[in-house]
């Protein structure tokens, strides 16, 4: 009989995309996969499109919100727990996988109430509130970065589940010896990167640099106009659909330090200048960036000290030192966990009794 797995993942791509990677491995192993999410998160669009049944919870995050939201939190969480309880009783899963974020809280708690094996996976180097709490009651605790949880949690480091296209970098290595710069302003647009990076690139001089810049929809026109004002040729897009191709094309990335970005850079062996989002909860992006920087795979530049002059100096230093780029690429690949999705799926199936 096929094992039944419920996945708890929602809100942002940082939770949803690694969960989809695991879901694909589970489905290929013959398991039935169901999803629990919200109607307002990314999962509402991409999970049904991937062919997975999804059930809805009425819940949202409360950290960083105002007093009014926090006052409503107990009632909201109570309702979400009741919804999760009904869903789990109807779906009858053999195991539940929580991928962090507010969606995982009610479903994870109700899984334990019903005696269903609970596995959690943390994508960041600093665990989020939900996973810190669930780690005390979960049957298995998995982490993307070694040491994310305290030793008492008994966590196993699996790495972050990668999209199938990113996994293919395991089988080929692209030499990073050119002058191709990939700028990732994020799906929502990172103002600091979109406004400072073009000006820094305009200061480089010397050999020409090929530029690709993902701006996010909100800042696309402004950034494109800025490149034109600076007389710089650049391929500017609101979104880059084929990230595998972009990673393979680039010799250097300039970007934020979300968990999946850091993991994909490592898998692609792509050297990077990382500018962590300074307002991320618990400053987890700085911790993520440190993981690559400490290994010599990236340069960390705090946004508080970022300006076009210092950034231009760093970009020039990297592009002019081909040996250093290659060393950074090798260091990144040494950190990669190409089998993370398979490892997480295997734990789920073990707990499900497969």
Swiss-Prot record:
Recorded metabolic or biological pathway in which this protein acts: Cell wall biogenesis; peptidoglycan biosynthesis
UniProt membrane topology term: Peripheral membrane protein
Enzyme class at the top of the EC tree: transferase
Positions annotated to bind UDP-N-acetyl-alpha-D-glucosamine: 12-14, 124, 163, 187, 240, 285
Keyword Cell membrane in record: yes
UniProt record similarity statement: Belongs to the glycosyltransferase 28 family. MurG subfamily.
UniProt name for this protein: UDP-N-acetylglucosamine--N-acetylmuramyl-(pentapeptide) pyrophosphoryl-undecaprenol N-acetylglucosamine transferase
Species, as recorded: Methylococcus capsulatus (strain ATCC 33009 / NCIMB 11132 / Bath)
Upper taxonomic lineage: Bacteria, Pseudomonadati, Pseudomonadota, Gammaproteobacteria, Methylococcales
